[in-house]
């Protein structure tokens, strides 16, 4: 479980090859383009995650202290993680927890552990900030490596009260998490407007969309 590894709480962490640090405003367009490259044609033809990132930074739910990037020795940013607060609603009780994602790594740098290290840094810092848990939607096989498990095990469900394997939770404070149950209320930033996306796409080089096997929103 990666959250158990001792990571320095500094604003940056250096490996032999890469530097991990907090995102700066000067990184914004580069990391948005990175996110676009990372998610293009993965879940649907094209993607909208880069617009999610842009809108998240302007939202009240955004947690800038948990947004790390990975850069090479040549200062090229090859990975980035974004986190926000989400509400777990239990009738009239509202519990604020951490929501992970998007996490993006340039295709040519994937499968090198960069995404997991970014996640690790954010989880360690979130624990320091006092969050009870982190939730996300993602590949269960991948995120179990970072200590995530089915959110339903903790009594946490998606907005309509149902469960899905892709909705996962990682414990950061077990005592606090015992007091939390309910349904996740996804922020509207995760559902960008098609017209806004089309206009935003004009800022990037043209890129052909493809319908591919395995796309869940094709």
Please provide the spans of the model-predicted regions.
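Conserved acetyl-CoA-binding loop-helix of GNAT-fold acetyltransferases
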Residues: 100, 105, 111-124, 135-136
């Amino acid at each position: 479980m990666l959250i158990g590894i001792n990571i320095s709480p500094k604003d940056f962490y250096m490996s032999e090859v890469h530097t991990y640090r907090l995102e700066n405003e000067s990184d914004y367009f580069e990391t948005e383009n990175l996110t676009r490259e990372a998610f293009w044609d993965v879940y649907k033809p094209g993607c909208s995650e880069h617009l999610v990132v842009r809108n998240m930074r302007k939202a009240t739910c955004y947690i800038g202290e948990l947004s790390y990037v990975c850069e090479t020795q040549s200062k090229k940013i090859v990975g980035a993680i974004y986190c926000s607060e989400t509400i777990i609603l239990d009738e009239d009780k509202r519990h604020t927890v951490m929501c992970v994602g998007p996490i993006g790594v340039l295709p040519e740098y994937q499968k090198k552990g960069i995404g997991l290290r970014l996640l690790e840094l954010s989880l360690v810092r979130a624990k320091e900030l006092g969050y009870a848990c982190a939730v996300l939607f993602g590949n269960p096989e991948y995120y179990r490596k970072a200590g995530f498990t089915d959110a339903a095990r903790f009594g946490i469900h998606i907005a309509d009260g149902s469960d899905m394997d892709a909705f996962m939770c990682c414990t950061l404070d077990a005592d606090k998490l015992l007091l939390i149950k309910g349904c996740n209320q996804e922020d509207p930033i995760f559902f960008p407007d098609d017209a806004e996306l089309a206009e935003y796409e004009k800022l990037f080089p043209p890129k052909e969309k493809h319908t591919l096997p395995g796309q869940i929103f094709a």
